[in-house]
Amino acid sequence: MSGSIANTYLFLSVNLRNVKNVILFGETGVGKSSVINLMAGREVAQTSSDLPSCTLHAEEYAFTFPGGTEIRIFNTVGLEEPDMGVKPFMDAIVKAHQLVTSLHRVGGVDLLLFCVRGGRITKTTRRTYQLFYEVLCGSDVPLAVIVTHLEGEENVM
């Protein structure tokens, strides 16, 4: 199949199945993989409190929810500007751009899930938000925020 025919076929097959594409993003160590495991109801994504980052490239997880809605969640590489070094940081940005571009070929991005650590909004947090929401998705995709690490916080509810 030629490239454009294959892309058209993939676009139609994904959209006919009513699949929603969701990108989960945030800094390194905020718990993106734990959110995936919570949604799955079991451990499907590697997590670690010892390693700087478990996710080295965007990983896809497919879920079918009651009612038949299919969701593909892409767990992205965590960004940590000061600690990553310039080359790994730029590589992560290139990978994020490639992910968004490839999803636009098959129906687009339906939702951004921004994972943040409770009580910790840093410059990197703000820049990560700007990169995904404003730059890569043109402020044109619905966004929801997931706040993690609230176990020790008082009066959060």
Task: Kindly give the residue locations of the regions a language model identified.
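Switch I (effector-binding) loop of TRAFAC-class P-loop GTPase G-domains
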Residues: 40-72, 95-98
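AAA+ P-loop NTPase catalytic core and its hallmark functional loops
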Residues: 78-84
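Short, flexible boundary segments at extreme N-termini or domain junctions of P-loop NTPases and their
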Residues: 1-27, 97
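GTPase G-domain guanine-specificity segment
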Residues: 150-157
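Glycine-rich phosphate-binding P-loop
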Residues: 20-48
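Inter-motif core of Ras-like GTPase G domains
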Residues: 84-120, 130-144
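Short, structured motif recognition centered on aromatic/hydrophobic residues
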Residues: 22-26, 58, 73, 111-117, ...
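Short, low-complexity cationic-aromatic patches
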Residues: 13, 19, 23, 29-30, ...
